Amino acid sequence: MNVFMLPSWYPSLRQPMAGLFARDQARALALVRPGWNVVVGGWGHHDGALSLRSAGDSWRALVWRARTRPGWQAGAGATPGPLHELLTPRLSWTLALAQGGARGLLSASRRNLALAQARFGAIDVVHAHVGFPAGWIAAQLAAEPGLPYVLTEHMSPFPFPALQDGHGGPVPALRLAFEQAAATVAVSAALAERIRAFGLPCSDVIPNAVDEARFAPDAESDPARFVFFTLGALVPQKGVDVLLRALAQLPPQPRPVKLHIGGDGPERGALQALAATLGVQDRVRWLGALRPEQTPAHFARCDAFVLASRHETFGVVLAEALMSGKPVVATRCGGPQDIVTPANGLLVPPQDPAALAVAMQAVLTNPARYDATAMRADAVARFGLRAVGERVAALCERVVAAHTAAGRKGGA
C-alpha cells in the first residue's frame, strides 16, 4: 500500500519539536507495515513561516525559501520500514490573512503527490493531520483522482480562533475537510466530543504515537532534592503561571524542591518576573528551548512531571514522562484524562494553583507508590510506536477496502 501523509505541523530547522507526533506516527506506520511506502509531503512548515511581529523571522523565512531546493529529503530517523519525506518549499503566514497562504501549500502538495506517484505508483490513501490547512488540502487532492483520505485532528482549542466563523463554529474550509473525509480521527475522547458538538463526524479515537526507544526509566535523579519538570512552549495555554503559583504554595519540605522548565516563548519574560514576585526564582531553572534529542535526559533526571495546561487535545509530554518511568501531575483539560490514571499520577482542575500544589505535595511525599517499570509498560502498550501504528494501519486498510468496494459497486 502507498500512503501519502499531509501534516499541518512537522519538525523543521527552526522548530524541531513542532509536529514531532506527526513524524512519529509516520514512523509507526512504516514500522508495522514494512511492505508499505509511507510518503510525507511537506512545504517547510515553520522554516517558511513569515511573521508580522518579527522582521528577523520573516527575513530568515525568505532566505530559507531562496536557498531551499525541492525534492526527496534525508534524515527521517532510523525506521525499519520505508518512510520517505518530500519537500516543496513554500512560504506561509498567519491564518488571519488569505488563509495563511493555503493556496501555495496546495500547489506544493500537488507537486509532492505527483512525485510520490511517479516513484511508487498510485497512492492508495491520503492521511492528513489537522483539519486546516492539511485536511482542506487533502479534500482538494482527493476530489481530483477520487482518492480517499483520513483526517486526524490535533487542534487545541478546536477550532482555532482564526478558523471560527461568526458564531464560534468551524469555518467552511474546516467543515469541508471533515465532511469529505473517508474517516475522521481525534487524538483524545475529549477532542472527539468537541468535534461532534459542532455536527462534524469523528469516527475514531487514536492517540498520538511516542517512540518508546527514546525514553527509559533511569535512576539519574538526585535523592538529596526533588525535581519537578515541565516541558512546552511558554505561552498562556501551557499554564506555567499557574505552576509557578502552585510551587509558591508548597509547604516547607525536608529537602529542596526544584522546578525545571523546558521550552521558550513570548511569555518567558513575564513568567520570570512572576517567579521573582512569588519569591521562587531560586527554585526554578529555565532550560530554554530543547531539541528532541535533549529531552530524554531531562525526563530521566526529574522525579515527577507536571503539565498545568489550560487546554490540551492530547499531551505527548505526559506519555513521554510515563515512558521514562516518572509519575505525572496534570490538569483535567482534555487529553490528559485519556493518559493519567491512579496508577501513574494525579489530575486536578485547570487554573487552580491550590489544587495543583496539593497534588504536587502528594507526589513528592510518597513517590514510592508509583512503579516506574509498570508505568512505562502501560504507556508503551497504549502509546508506543507499534501499538499506535497497528491502529492507524488497520484504519487505512479499512478505508481503502471500503473505497475499493464502492468502486466495484459503482462500476457494476
Model-predicted segments: where are they?
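Short alpha-helical donor nucleotide-sugar binding micro-motif in glycosyltransferases
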Residues: 178, 289-290, 297-302
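A short, well-ordered alpha-helix in the C-terminal region of glycosyltransferases
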Residues: 283, 369-382
